[in-house]
């Protein structure tokens, strides 16, 4: 089910959702097309029924050398909300985020007003310039620790007790835009290969099993003809007849680079997906 469809001026990418008191907060990359260049922002929209959404509100600054984007998810810690996100610097002529791309968190008390981004030092106590290019963060509250997943050498992951001090743990081959949920003592890693939304499973982050790749009836979606990608799965049992919702975006770059629309699907078993809530 479509949420926001791309226009000449804007496209919508990289969804991440959080549910609080019956309200869905949908964070995403908003791409603005101007005659001079594209600008990337993190924006938010809200809904209580998956159908009616508020107008997007931009949360980050307009700066082509930062291009805050790709919100990963929100977690709550010590009564504060933390949203992880990336920078995606594109100097004149660069198509993709350059080697200065890094990952950050923003903190909030109310999910609406956010402090300035703070660098996620997921490689430990090394300088920012030595961290290497990294994008697409995702934070998992794993009970006695936090795990930060990010796109570098496939998917890399680091652990922390306090969201401030991190230890790098390793990496494995994987697509981008990782989202991780834990089911029955098993971690399910949703990720994006060249097309589709892939699911990998692991119990120990050492051995990984390929589960399936979802295409969500792409052939019937002209707005997603180039790619189905960036799946974000969340438990919606508190507000929906279905146990899960998966927000995602579909690429159609006929008009311009990074052209995309946001949509959502619903499931009880993570295998069969429905278009209507």
Model-derived segments and spans:
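Carbohydrate-active catalytic/glycan-binding domains of CAZyme proteins
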Residues: 1-277
């Amino acid at each position: 089910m479509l949420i926001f469809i791309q226009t000449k001026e804007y496209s919508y990418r990289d969804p991440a959702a959080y549910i609080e008191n019956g309200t869905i907060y949908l964070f995403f990359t908003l791409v603005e097309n101007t005659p001079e260049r594209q600008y990337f922002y993190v924006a938010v929209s809200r809904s209580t029924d998956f159908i009616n959404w508020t107008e997007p509100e931009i949360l980050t600054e307009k700066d082509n050398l930062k291009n805050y984007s790709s919100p990963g998810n929100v977690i709550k810690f010590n009564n504060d909300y933390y949203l992880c996100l990336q920078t995606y610097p594109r100097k004149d002529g660069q198509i993709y985020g350059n080697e200065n791309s890094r990952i950050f968190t923003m903190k909030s008390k109310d999910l609406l007003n956010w402090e300035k981004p703070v660098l996620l030092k997921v490689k430990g106590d090394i300088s920012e310039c030595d961290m290497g290019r990294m994008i697409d963060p995702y934070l998992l509250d794993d009970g006695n620790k936090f795990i930060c997943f990010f796109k570098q050498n496939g998917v890399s992951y680091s652990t922390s007790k306090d969201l401030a001090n991190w230890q790098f743990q390793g990496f494995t081959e994987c697509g981008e835009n990782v989202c991780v949920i834990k089911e029955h003592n098993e971690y399910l890693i949703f990720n994006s290969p060249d097309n589709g939304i892939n699911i990998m499973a692991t119990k120990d982050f050492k051995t990984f099993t390929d589960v399936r790749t979802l295409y969500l009836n792409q052939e019937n979606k002209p707005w997603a003809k180039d790619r189905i990608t960036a799946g974000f799965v969340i438990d919606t049992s508190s507000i929906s007849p279905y146990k899960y919702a998966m927000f995602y975006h579909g690429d159609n770059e006929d008009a311009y680079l990074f052209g995309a629309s946001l949509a959502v699907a619903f499931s009880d078993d993570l295998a069969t997906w429905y278009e209507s809530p």
